[in-house]
Amino acid sequence: MRGSTQGCSPTGREAIVLDTGAFIAGKAAALPGRLATPPRVLEEVRDRGSRSLLELLQSTGRLEVLAPSTRALERAREEARRAGVLGRLSGADLEVLALALDLAWQGCRVAVATDDYTLQRLAARLGLGVVRLRYRGAV
């Protein structure tokens, strides 16, 4: 994982990986603990309010922008292909899943913060937690 500033201990730390919806919904700042997001999510966050929230979280050190490993991206793609949903996922969605996998492989207890039902189901299939932002959710 490129850009990693801290790992997780064997006993685990909690980490929440944010998709674009966490910024658009304005919910990112209310989430507890370590927050992380991949670079492609930054590219998708365009509106002024969401962008301000993202930049505030980055500048205060609450949010880490981390690139997922190639290994984790391959695993996320493979699982999406098996589930028959690869065509429904954006590059940012795949990076969110892959980053969550990387953090889990480091020993973190990881959840993906998203309202995207496809992303929720894949996260659950991969043994990751899910944080719903505005809607009840698929899992």
Curated annotation (Swiss-Prot):
Q: What SMART domains does the annotation carry?
A: PINc
Query: What Pfam family is a match, any one?
Result: PIN_6
Keywords of the record: Hydrolase, Magnesium, Metal-binding, Nuclease, Toxin-antitoxin system
Instruction: List the InterPro entries hit by this protein, alphabetically.
Output: NOB1 (IPR039907), PIN-like_dom_sf (IPR029060), PIN_dom (IPR002716), Ribonuclease_PIN (IPR033411), VapC_family (IPR022907)
Give the record's GO CC terms: preribosome, small subunit precursor
Q: What is its EC number?
A: 3.1.-.-
Top class in the EC scheme: hydrolase
One of its GO biological process terms is: maturation of SSU-rRNA
Q: Cite the PINc domain residue spans from the record.
A: 14-121
Entry annotated with the keyword Magnesium: yes
**UniProt: Mg(2+) binding residues:** D19
Sorted alphabetically, which SUPFAM superfamilies does this protein's record hold? PIN domain-like (SSF88723)
One GO molecular function term of this record is: RNA endonuclease activity
Identify its protein family. Answer: Belongs to the PINc/VapC protein family.
Function noted in UniProt: Toxic component of a type II toxin-antitoxin (TA) system. An RNase.
Q: What name is this protein filed under?
A: Ribonuclease VapC3
Species of the source: Aeropyrum pernix (strain ATCC 700893 / DSM 11879 / JCM 9820 / NBRC 100138 / K1)
Gene that encodes it: vapC3
